[in-house]
C-alpha cells in the first residue's frame, strides 16, 4: 500500500511513513525525472520555528525507518534502533529526527521500480543519479515541508556521503554535521567491488536489461550474490574469522559438496536482502556511490573541503576495510569545521558505525551540541 501524500508544511505522524511530492527534478546530468516523490518519517515534534530538525541519512540498503518495530510500510525494524527517542542521542524531547528514503530507493521514494508517467515501471529508463542529486531531492522535500534549515545532518557510509555533499554544497542550510565511515570520493577499491556487485546482478538472466518489474521475473540470484560480496566488505576480517573460522556448516562436509559456516551465513544475508530490496535500486544506488566525489566541479577534493565552514564531527571505525580510517583522516584534516578525527574502536568493520551505538551516540550528542552554539 502506498503511503499517504504529506500536505505541504506538514509532517507524518511520529514513526509513520508519508510521501512528499516534489514535482519534476533536474539531475546533475541534466536529465529530468517527472513527478518525484520522497518518503519521509519523523520522531519528535517540530519546533514552532521549524529549526530543530536532525536529518538522519541512511546507507545503501537502508530506508527512512531509523528506529522502531517493523510494520506495514517497513518490513524490518529500525536500522539504527535506539538512536532517536526520548533521552536517546537524538533526544526527541528536544529534537525532531527526520529521515527520508533516498531518491532512487524502493521504500516509498521514486526509483526504478516506481511507475513512470506512462503507467509502466521506470526500469532501465530510470536515469543515473548521484549523491548530489539525492541531497537535492532531500532539500526539495524539506522545502515542501516549510523547513529551510536543519540543526544537523547525520549519516554513515552512503548516508555519510550524503551528509558530506550537504555541508559542502548547501552550507547555509545546516548548522552541524556528523560524517561517519566514508571518504571524500570513491576509491578504486570501492569502485571495483561495487561494479563487480552490479555485474553479478546484470548477469542474472532475470535482470531483463533492467526491465523485469512487470514480467513476474526477479534477478534474485544476482542480487543475493551481490549482497554476499558486499557483506564481506561490511564486516571485520577478525570478527568473521573468530565467528566462523574454517568450520563446516553443521554436519555438512565442504570437501564433499557441503558448505562452510561462513558460506551459509552469507547465503542467509543474501536471501534476507532479496526479500525486501529491489535489484534495480541496488544497481542505481551502488552506481551513485561509485560516482561519489565531493570535489567534482569544485576544483577538486581539497578545495571543496577547505571551503566548507560547517562545524563537523568526522568518525571512522578501526576495522573498516571498505572505508579505511585514512579516508576519514583526510576529511578531518581538510574540513575547517572539524577539530580532529574521532575513532570508534570496533571489530565489526564498516558496520561498526551501526553496531557501536554507545560510542556513536556520544558523537551524535556532541554534534547536536555544535548545533546549539
UniProtKB/Swiss-Prot annotation:
Record-annotated disulphide pairs: none
Main localisation: cytoplasm
Keywords for the protein's UniProt record, in alphabetical order: Acyltransferase, Amino-acid biosynthesis, Cytoplasm, Methionine biosynthesis, Transferase
Single GO MF annotation: homoserine O-acetyltransferase activity
EC number(s) reported in the record: 2.3.1.31
Pfam families named in the record: Abhydrolase_1 (PF00561)
Origin superkingdom: Bacteria
Keyword Transferase in annotation: yes
Pathway the protein acts in: Amino-acid biosynthesis; L-methionine biosynthesis via de novo pathway; O-acetyl-L-homoserine from L-homoserine: step 1/1
Sites where the protein binds substrate: 227, 351
InterPro entries hit by this protein: AB_hydrolase_1 (IPR000073), AB_hydrolase_fold (IPR029058), HAT_MetX-like (IPR008220)
Keyword Acyltransferase belongs to the record: yes
Catalytic activity: L-homoserine + acetyl-CoA = O-acetyl-L-homoserine + CoA
Domain AB hydrolase-1: 52-356
Location of this chain's protein in the cell: Cytoplasm
Active-site residues, Swiss-Prot/TrEMBL: 157, 320, 350
GO cellular component: cytoplasm
One of the GO biological process terms: methionine biosynthetic process
Family per similarity comment: Belongs to the AB hydrolase superfamily. MetX family.
Functional description taken from the UniProt entry: Transfers an acetyl group from acetyl-CoA to L-homoserine, forming acetyl-L-homoserine.
Subunit structure: Homodimer.
PANTHER family: HOMOSERINE O-ACETYLTRANSFERASE
Protein name: Homoserine O-acetyltransferase
Amino acid at each position: 500500500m502506498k503511503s499517504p501524500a504529506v500536505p505541504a508544511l506538514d509532517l507524518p505522524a511520529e514513526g509513520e511513513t508519508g510521501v512528499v511530492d516534489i514535482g519534476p527534478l533536474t539531475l546533475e546530468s541534466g536529465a529530468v525525472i517527472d513527478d518525484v516523490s520522497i518518503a519521509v518519517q519523523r520522531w519528535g515534534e517540530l519546533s514552532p520555528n521549524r529549526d530543530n530538525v536532525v536529518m538522519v541519512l541512511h546507507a545503501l540498503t537502508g530506508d527512512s525507518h531509523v528506529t522502531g518495530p517493523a510494520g506495514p510500510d517497513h518490513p524490518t525494524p529500525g536500522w539504527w534502533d535506539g538512536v532517536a527517542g526520548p533521552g536517546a542521542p537524538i533526544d526527541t524531547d528536544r529534537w525532531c529526527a527526520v529521515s527520508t528514503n533516498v531518491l532512487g530507493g524502493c521504500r516509498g521514494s521514486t526509483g526504478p521500480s516506481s511507475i513512470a508517467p506512462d503507467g509502466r515501471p521506470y526500469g532501465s529508463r530510470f536515469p543515473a543519479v548521484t549523491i548530489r542529486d539525492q541531497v537535492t531531492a532531500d532539500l526539495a522535500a524539506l522545502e515542501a515541508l516549510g523547513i529551510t534549515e536543519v540543526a544537523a545532518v547525520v549519516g554513515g557510509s552512503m548516508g555519510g556521503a550524503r551528509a558530506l555533499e550537504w555541508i559542502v554544497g548547501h552550507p547555509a542550510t545546516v548548522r552541524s554535521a556528523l560524517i561517519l565511515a566514508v571518504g571524500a570520493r570513491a576509491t578504486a577499491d570501492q569502485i571495483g567491488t561495487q561494479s563487480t556487485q552490479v555485474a553479478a546482478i546484470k548477469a542474472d538472466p532475470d535482470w531483463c536489461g533492467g526491465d523485469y518489474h512487470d514480467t513476474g521475473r526477479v534477478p534474485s540470484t544476482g542480487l543475493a550474490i551481490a549482497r554476499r560480496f558486499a557483506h564481506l566488505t561490511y564486516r571485520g576480517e577478525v570478527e568473521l574469522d573468530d565467528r566462523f573460522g574454517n568450520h563446516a556448516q553443521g554436519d555438512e562436509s565442504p570437501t564433499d559438496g557441503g558448505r562452510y559456516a561462513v558460506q551459509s551465513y552469507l547465503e542467509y544475508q543474501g536471501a534476507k536482502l532479496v526479500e525486501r530490496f529491489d535489484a534495480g535500486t541496488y544497481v542505481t544506488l551502488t552506481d551513485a556511490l561509485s560516482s561519489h566525489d565531493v570535489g567534482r566541479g569544485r576544483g577538486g577534493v581539497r578545495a571543496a573541503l577547505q571551503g566548507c565552514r560547517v562545524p563537523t564531527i568526522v568518525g571512522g571505525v578501526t576495522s573498516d576495510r571498505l572505508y579505511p580510517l585514512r579516508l576519514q583522516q583526510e576529511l578531518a584534516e581538510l574540513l575547517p569545521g572539524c577539530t580532529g578525527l574521532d575513532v570508534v574502536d570496533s571489530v565489526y568493520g564498516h558496520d561498526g558505525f551501526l553496531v557501536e551505538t554507545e560510542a556513536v551516540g556520544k558523537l551524535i550528542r556532541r554534534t547536536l551540541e555544535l548545533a546549539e552554539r
